[in-house]
């Protein structure tokens, strides 16, 4: 192996040494992204985009199963629309990118580059809705948004990112609330079943909720370094936007009413979460459901008669059921290929050589445990299918164990400070529910309330931070 090849495969900073550099090394060396000339605007390369496509395909199917339809709304939004909902514009104003010229001519009105689409969608809904018979509106769009971030990191916080945003209208508050929680549950199911990423679900505090929302619900995941990642949100917007945009319909009694509105979204930051939950010092570890290549076949001693033919035969047997690739490159050794595919996180590697052919077997290597076993070629399809299922279950189990080991209960502010300094992670504590107390905690420690979980625990009767009567048990953490 040449020095260049050795560096390409092995030079990943250990996560225990420098987690941020480990993350950067992994995304670069596995060819997920590249940096563009504009800060914060990343290029998602084919391997990274294939991961997003697999997430997108899974979720799009779930959306359609629950009655939602896809559409597309414009990228540019007139400033006057953004100003219609005061709380919303105040929340997004620092992050908005503006278009001021068309060609060489200054525009009569500034246009903002979509940071989120509530305003333009509500403007259109006001024209489309007339009667209660039109409801519910169940629409989603897949697009990119721009939020001018000062500090950026690929997938986790970028000035442009890909996402989906659903926007629905309903007759009653109860229907809107049911929709909000239904979509949050779809996100949770996607995170745990597809991404093997355990999440805590709950409600955001008033301080942390979406600008203009009646209530925001979230799913929060814990990364290897003990920081939290907000992995998806679902908002009950009440009648805030529908009133501001004069969206009305004639109800069953012929009276004009404002409908109730929801919005919900997840983005490519899920990919950052997958990397930081499952990855190790060899590189990516991808859950089978999203891996661009689920199975890679590497011939050993491919120059020997029959080896390459058998490898092609195995690929043809597997390709209709699995995403499979045959690495028949003749300018790299099998050992180099093993290291490269491990770094790229492919769940299963099949090794086939002359002795394997003689014994009617292949060696199956699993990326999650770095173990290999011989499997009869007669049982190959069944063995691969079972192993992929085992890998997904094992990744979820290990991620839950990691999260639980990094989750702590504290009773006092000093105790939380000590825990967060020594061993960052999720902290569970009782909280009074007051904004001033929450702001004090953040100002003192940089720790935020991640959510008020649906599954409440009684850890005491007083707030851990100010001593007042406690209202909720909350999860806190430093976050991306």
Swiss-Prot record:
Main localization, broad class: cytoplasm
EC class:
ligase
Molecular function (GO) terms for this protein are:
ATP binding; catalytic activity, acting on a protein; proline-tRNA ligase activity; transferase activity
E.C. designation(s): 6.1.1.15
Q: Which Pfam families match?
A: HGTP_anticodon, ProRS-C_1, tRNA-synt_2b
Q: Which residues form a coiled coil?
A: none
Sorted UniProt keywords: Aminoacyl-tRNA synthetase, ATP-binding, Cytoplasm, Ligase, Nucleotide-binding, Protein biosynthesis
Q: Can you say where in the cell this protein is located? A: Cytoplasm
Can you supply one Gene Ontology CC term for this chain's record? Answer: cytoplasm
List the CDD domains hit by this protein, alphabetically: ProRS_anticodon_zinc, ProRS_core_arch_euk
**An individual GO BP term:** prolyl-tRNA aminoacylation
| Database matches in PANTHER family | BIFUNCTIONAL GLUTAMATE_PROLINE--TRNA LIGASE, PROLYL-TRNA SYNTHETASE
Q: Entry's NCBIfam families? A: proS_fam_I
Its domain description in UniProt is: Consists of three domains: the N-terminal catalytic domain, the anticodon-binding domain and the C-terminal extension.
Q: What's the protein here called?
A: Proline--tRNA ligase
Organism of origin:
Alkaliphilus oremlandii (strain OhILAs)
């Amino acid at each position: 192996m040449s020095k260049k090849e050795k560096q390409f495969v092995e030079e990943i900073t250990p996560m225990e040494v420098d987690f941020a550099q480990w993350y950067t090394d992994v995304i670069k060396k596995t060819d997920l992204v590249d940096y563009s000339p504009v800060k914060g605007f990343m290029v998602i390369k084919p391997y990274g985009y294939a991961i997003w496509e697999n997430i997108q395909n899974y979720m799009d199917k779930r959306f359609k199963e629950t009655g939602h339809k896809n559409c597309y709304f414009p990228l540019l939004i007139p400033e006057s629309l953004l100003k219609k909902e005061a709380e919303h514009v105040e929340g997004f104003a620092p992050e908005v990118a503006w278009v001021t010229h068309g060609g060489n001519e200054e525009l009569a009105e500034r246009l903002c580059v979509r940071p989120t689409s509530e305003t333009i969608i509500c403007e259109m809904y006001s024209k489309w809705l007339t009667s209660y018979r039109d409801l519910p509106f169940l629409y989603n769009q897949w697009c990119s948004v721009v939020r001018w971030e000062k500090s950026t990191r690929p997938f986790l916080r970028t000035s442009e990112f890909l996402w989906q945003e659903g926007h629905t209208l309903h007759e009653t508050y109860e229907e809107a609330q049911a929709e909000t929680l239904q979509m949050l549950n779809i996100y949770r199911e996607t995170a745990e079943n597809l991404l093997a990423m355990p999440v805590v679900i709950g409600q955001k505090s008033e301080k942390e909720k979406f600008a203009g929302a009646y209530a925001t619900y979230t799913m929060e995941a814990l990364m290897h370094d003990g920081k939290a990642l907000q992995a998806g949100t679902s908002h009950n917007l009440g009648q805030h936007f529908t009133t501001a945009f004069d969206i009305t319909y004639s109800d069953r009694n012929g009276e004009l009413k404002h409908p109730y509105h929801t919005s919900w979204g997840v983005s490519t930051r899920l990919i950052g979460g997958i990397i930081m939950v499952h990855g190790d010092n060899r590189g990516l570890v991808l859950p089978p459901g999203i891996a661009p290549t689920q199975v890679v076949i590497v011939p050993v001693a491919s120059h020997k008669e029959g080896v390459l033919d058998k490898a092609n035969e195995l690929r043809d047997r597997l390709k209709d059921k699995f995403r499979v690739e045959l690495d028949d490159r003749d300018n790299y050794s099998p050992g180099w290929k093993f290291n490269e595919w491990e770094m790229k996180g492919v769940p299963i590697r099949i090794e086939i050589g002359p002795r394997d052919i003689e014994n009617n077997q292949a060696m199956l290597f699993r990326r999650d445990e770095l173990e290999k076993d011989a499997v009869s070629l007669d049982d190959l399809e069944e063995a691969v299918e079972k192993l992929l299922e085992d890998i997904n279950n094992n990744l979820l189990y290990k991620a839950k164990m990691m999260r639980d080991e990094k989750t702590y209960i504290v009773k006092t502010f000093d105790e939380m400070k000590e825990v967060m300094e020594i061993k960052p992670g999720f902290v569970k504590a009782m909280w009074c529910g007051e904004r001033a107390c929450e702001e004090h905690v953040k100002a003192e420690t940089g720790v935020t309330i991640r959510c008020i979980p649906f599954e409440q625990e009684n850890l005491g009767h007083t707030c851990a931070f100010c001593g007042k009567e406690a209202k909720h048990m909350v999860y806190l953490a430093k976050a991306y």
